[in-house]
Amino acid sequence: MRATFSSRLVAIVAALAITVVVPALAGRPGGSAYGAGVSQQAVGAAAQAAAVRYWTTGRMTRELIRQPPPGTRLAWLSGDTAGAGLRWTHGGPVAAAVGRIFFSLGGTDYVCSGALVGGAHPDVVLTAAHCVTGGPGRGRATQWAANWMFVPGFADGRLPYGEYTAHRFLVSPGWTAPSGGEADDFAFVQVTPATPGEGPGAAKPPPGLSVEFASSQGMAALTRSYVFGYPAEPPYTGLYPAFCAGRVTASGGQVGMPCGMTAGDSGGPWLAGFRPRRGTGQVTAVTTYKMSGDLAVLYGAVLGPQARALYQRALRSAR
């Protein structure tokens, strides 16, 4: 078990060995800061190639083969599924854009969730900051992830749109500062297609999801959301996308919702204005943690003005 941000928090990032872990601050040197409101780390071509070699299909799926929970019909469309954590089987842009993240940190392999954002030709992934760094800076050097890989639409070991490697990590300075906290736990990653997809239409990359930023860091755009991710602890396997839906509460730059999804869901998007039959909506937050004393509620960081500035920087420098 790694050190927590606070004694009450459990981050929803999972080790491939299927243990619940939380990000720990690393001791080795890492990123650098530039400009106002951005901490970043570039990833070279050699490191990107190493990630492709490292994450074989076998490594991606090892120790994660379990029977998934039963699916559901469209009856849930008329009500909340809070706490259910159902498998998403209805397609749409969300099924293609949301994906699984694989990375190494401190010699251990981990998994998270994330989503392509930014329109028809996306080259930016939204995830949690602790899915690219070792944790809040607490005044020490930040360790950045190695072997970082994003697989959009990952399902049962298939890579329908191929693999994306990280070109640059961007997080809020609030996350790496000594006072960094959960409200700053969001990151944007500039990505590069690394391997082709599998199956019909695989050459065409999936469109990125739309992002809607709150007018202030402490407010969410709407009171109802759908949350997506790749939970990996039982009864889940991490081999398919799952979701929860329901009303949310917002306070202090964070949102909460009853949801039974487990470790591995960190970095998954929260979508407001979601249309289940179309699989479309606006991303307003990103999954960050659960309270150790109340694992029935999932929490996320609201994407406010600081996230908007980071996102715009990521788009400009990626294009």
Where are these regions (language model features)?
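C-terminal cap/linker of serine protease catalytic domains
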Residues: 284-319
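Protease-domain processing segments flanking chymotrypsin-fold serine proteases, especially trypsin-like
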Residues: 2-3, 10, 22-119
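Terminal peptide-recognition signature
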Residues: 56, 101, 114, 123, ...
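Chymotrypsin/trypsin-fold serine protease catalytic domain
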Residues: 166, 182-258
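Catalytic nucleophile loop of clan PA
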Residues: 260-286
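Conserved catalytic-core segment of clan PA serine endopeptidases
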Residues: 84-109, 117-118, 139-198
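Acidic glycine-/aspartate-rich tracts in secreted/extracellular proteins
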Residues: 131-132, 154-158, 193-196, 231-233, ...
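Loop/turn elements at helix/coil->beta-strand transitions in domains of secreted/extracellular proteins
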Residues: 96, 121-123, 221-224, 252-253, ...
